[in-house]
Regions:
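Rossmann-like AdoMet
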Residues: 1-28
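S-adenosylmethionine/decaboxylated-SAM
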Residues: 22-275
Length: 275
């Protein structure tokens, strides 16, 4: 762990520009920082974006992992870095030796992210921890989606906030994203139907349906097939069921974690998606 980050974690304090100690009352926990580093090391993003900086704790975790990627760049935006955080976050990053890989902009995220889309910038990773209001988070994620390459990861902090949870649900239900952590797990019922589908593909159930019992079994078989489609096919559920009735567990969202990671599966067609 970088010495600057290690000092903050061990003392719970940050150092202001004039050398005084200040209680570190904002920032991510160590488990979330290690989760970020695990994601970064697994996917090795070359260009990443961070919304919000404050004291730079999340940025320190990210940059420590990014240092392992050649020619990596981390774009940070925080309109309150000097007015509220007294420049501590950027100072920490410079003291830690990451000045060469960060690009800081003291602009609102909705303005600078829009500028990046106009410049056709592409990114591989994003961390959203700015304004937690639903509209701000939604706009941040919407613009980041335009920048994010398929396979890229978006991590959102403070997932326990209803506003952030609802934004995640929207993107999982309406765009091509899946939840990849933490505590990702399959529904037991879904796993059962997937095992059944595997048996069908292997031909172990087919002969039974061709036997004299076929007439009795077919109605139940149709119910099994449709039940499997209902559980396995997200597009089918979108047509057949209200989105509000899809549970967090079905979307693989964690119950109690304070952060969540979504992976972009592919680019969505803006024209056809609107119909």
């Amino acid at each position: 762990m970088n010495q600057v980050l290690q000092s903050i974690v061990s003392t719970g304090s940050v150092v202001t520009e004039d050398g005084t100690l200040r209680t570190c009352d904002v920032g991510i926990a160590q488990d979330e920082g290690e989760f970020l580093q695990e994601i970064m090391r697994r996917h090795r993003p070359e260009v990443s974006v961070e919304v919000g900086c404050a004291y730079g704790i999340s940025s320190l975790y990210i940059c420590e992992a990014l240092r392992e990627v050649n020619a990596a760049k981390h774009i940070i935006m925080d309109p309150y870095q000097h007015s509220w955080s007294q420049g501590i976050g950027i100072a920490n990053l410079k003291r830690a030796g990451y000045a060469d890989i960060i690009e800081f902009h003291e602009d609102p995220s909705y303005q600078y992210l829009a500028r990046l889309t106009e410049e056709h910038v592409k990114i591989d990773f994003a961390f959203i921890d700015g304004n937690h209001s639903f509209d701000y988070v939604l706009v941040d994620f919407f613009l980041i989606d335009k920048l994010l390459e398929p396979g890229g990861i978006v991590v959102l902090d403070d997932f326990s906030y209803p506003s952030i949870r609802n934004v995640c649900r929207y993107f999982l239900l309406n765009l091509s994203y899946k939840c990849v952590g933490p505590q990702s797990r399959k529904l037991p019922e879904l796993a059962q139907w997937q095992r059944l589908a595997s048996r069908v593909r292997q031909g172990t159930i087919g002969p039974l349906l061709k036997s004299p019992w076929r007439r009795m079994l077919m109605p139940a078989w149709r119910m099994i097939v449709w039940r499997g489609v209902w559980l396995v096919s997200t597009p089918m559920r979108r047509f057949l069921v209200s989105r509000n009735s899809v549970t967090d567990a079905e979307l693989n969202l964690p119950n109690s974690a304070n952060y969540v990671a979504l992976q972009k599966l592919r680019d969505d067609d803006d024209v056809t998606r609107g119909f």
